[in-house]
Amino acid sequence: KTTITNYIRKHKNIPILDADNLSRELIKPNTYGYKKILDYFGNKIIDNKNNSEGIINRKLLRNIIFKNSESKEWIEKLLHPLIKEKMIEECSKYKNNQTIVLVIPLLFEAKFEDICTEIWLVKCPRELQKKRLITRDKISEKEAYDSINLQLSFEEKRKFSDIILDNSDDQNKWIDTIRELL
């Protein structure tokens, strides 16, 4: 997703909204999401290293929700509606644009399909996906697998997708497709 998003950002004049970036905004200190998370998890969720602002330790939060399905469900019930609302609000700023790219890693799991007019699914082998996650997020192999396993399978996602972009190895495959579509 990141490679394709970066390509669109560089070569097309199309707004891009990323659900992960919005979620980071929604849990910054003194926001509603931040306060709710602290109420639920307590101060143990605060990153104590070089952190005078009281920023939430996202890696610790991720580890907690991977190990505890109740916590995972709670955080999803809190954040998914907030992210969706924020994404709709941000989209309204671009109402004069014909196209807006929404990057939503858990599109189907969070039930965000209704805010999309067309769904593009980025395909890559699980092993490559795992490798990219480890490199990008600086997480362990187990954490990468846990993250991947939280998602619907590619086969399930494919059923609900309009376009499949293969980001396995040859960039020319998906670049040509994007040029045609945009």
Language-model features, listed with the residues they occupy:
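Well-ordered beta-strand positions
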Residues: 15, 63, 118, 162-163
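Small-molecule kinase domains that catalyze NTP-dependent phosphoryl transfer to phosphate-bearing small molecules
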Residues: 86, 95, 114-115, 135-181
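Walker A/P-loop
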Residues: 1-2
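An amphipathic alpha-helix signature
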Residues: 34-38, 126-134, 141, 145
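Short beta-strand-centered segment that lines the nucleotide-binding/catalytic pocket of NTP-utilizing
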Residues: 14-27
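ATP-dependent small-molecule kinase phosphotransfer cores
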Residues: 24-96
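ATP-dependent NMP and nucleoside kinases share a basic, alpha-helical "lid"
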Residues: 85-94, 99-135
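The feature captures the helix immediately C-terminal to the Walker
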Residues: 5-6
